[in-house]
Amino acid sequence: MAELPIAPIDRLIRKAGAERVSEDAAKALAEYLEEYAIEVGKKATEFARHAGRKTVKAEDVRLAVKA
């Protein structure tokens, strides 16, 4: 089960053009986004460690998304 709140996910889907969004759809997207964010976070952490830092910076996240 995703830790992300469902209401903001619902708003994102509506912002993308949907008129109505089922709770299951919002939950499914929340779960996917959480999994993706964790993977990006892991890669960003690797970039920070490789640079000799404990702190993950925005540039690490940008690189992780592109990797």
UniProtKB/Swiss-Prot annotation:
Statement: the UniProt record of this protein carries the keyword Cytoplasm: yes
Localization terms from the record: Cytoplasm; Chromosome
Gene3D superfamilies: Histone, subunit A
InterPro entries: Archaeal_histone_HMF (IPR050947), CBFA_NFYB_domain (IPR003958), Histone-fold (IPR009072), HmfB-like (IPR050004)
CDD domains given in the database record: HFD_archaea_histone-like (cd22909)
Quaternary structure and partners: Heterodimer. Dimers then assemble into higher oligomers, with the DNA wrapped around the protein core.
Protein name: Archaeal histone HAN1 subunit A
Native organism: Thermococcus zilligii
GN (gene name): han1A
